[in-house]
UniProtKB/Swiss-Prot annotation:
Family: Belongs to the AP2/ERF transcription factor family. ERF subfamily.
Pfam family for this entry, one: AP2
Compartment list: Nucleus
SMART domains according to UniProt: AP2
Disordered as annotated region, ranges: 20-44, 143-184
Sample GO molecular function, one term: DNA-binding transcription factor activity
PANTHER family named among the record's database cross-references: DEHYDRATION-RESPONSIVE ELEMENT-BINDING PROTEIN 1D (PTHR31839:SF11)
Start-end of DNA-binding region: 50-109
Biased composition (Low complexity): 20-29, 148-184
Function: Transcriptional activator that binds specifically to the DNA sequence 5'-[AG]CCGAC-3'. Binding to the C-repeat/DRE element mediates high salinity- and dehydration-inducible transcription.
Protein name, entry field: Dehydration-responsive element-binding protein 1J
GO CC annotation terms, alphabetical: nucleus
Record keywords, A-Z: Activator, DNA-binding, Nucleus, Stress response, Transcription, Transcription regulation
Length: 242
């Protein structure tokens, strides 16, 4: 009887000890981590939203160009790394012109005549890809060189136009305007006097007039008939000068 009672006590104590150990372990481990959602892991998009074959590389903000080789599934041609997305897009156009010619899909329509790149042989394999890469890089470098030369020429012409000497046109002050307006009536009066006296100076005109008054009158005509009234004057001559 006593033995059975002791065994029951031992069993109860062991059960309590095991329950306490399980609670302590659950508290130490904490709540279970949430399950990771199934599906493809998201990654940061580096491709350019507009240009073909262009994507961003690293945190430096540079752009790389990589094109797919036509007729070769899974093969890609690394063209190079560039400072701007536009340069990488031009490199893509140069590489595609070398690989596909006039049927190439271009980022810029004017690349067909602005980029001078030779067409690769039709049966070119992987051995020709380095030549295509070199030709594309040289075409882009030449295009950038032409652009910088044109920009320098435009800036030089603008500086020359800004440093040109000013025109030597006379500058009139308000005093000059008043003087010209004041001299206008005097000139008009002088012209009026000239027209009045037949283009002769005023002093010469009056001098000739005084000289004319000093001239002796002409002698009376001898054959002229006398002046008669209605009753007749009997042919008597009348002196005109007293």
């Amino acid at each position: 009887m006593d033995v059975a009672r002791d065994m029951e006590k031992n069993t109860t104590a062991m059960g309590q000890l095991m329950s306490s150990s399980a609670t302590t372990a659950a508290t130490a481990t904490g709540p279970a981590s949430p399950k990771r959602p199934a599906g493809r892991t998201k990654f940061q998009e580096t491709r350019h939203p507009v240009f073909r074959g262009v994507r961003r590389r690293g945190r430096a903000g540079r752009w790389v160009c990589e094109v797919r080789v036509p007729g070769s599934r899974g093969d890609r041609l690394w063209v190079g790394t560039f400072d701007t997305a536009e340069e990488a897009a031009r490199a893509h156009d140069a590489a595609m012109l070398a690989l596909c010619g006039a049927s190439a899909s271009l980022n810029f329509a004017d690349s067909a005549w602005l980029l001078h790149v030779p067409r690769a042989p039709v049966a070119s394999g992987h051995d020709q890809l380095p030549d295509v890469q070199r030709a594309a890089s040289e075409a882009v470098a030449e295009f950038q060189r032409r652009g910088s030369t044109a920009a320098t020429a435009t800036a030089t012409s603008g500086d020359a136009a800004s440093t040109a000497p000013p025109s030597s046109s006379p500058v009139l002050s308000p005093n000059d305007d008043n003087a010209s307006s004041a001299s206008t009536p005097a000139v008009a009066a002088a012209l009026d006097h000239g027209d009045m006296f037949g283009g002769m100076r005023t002093d010469l005109y009056f001098a000739s007039l005084a000289q004319g008054l000093l001239i002796e009158p002409p002698p009376p005509p001898t054959t002229a008939e006398g002046f008669c009234d209605d009753e007749g004057c009997g042919g008597a001559e009348m002196e005109l000068w007293s």
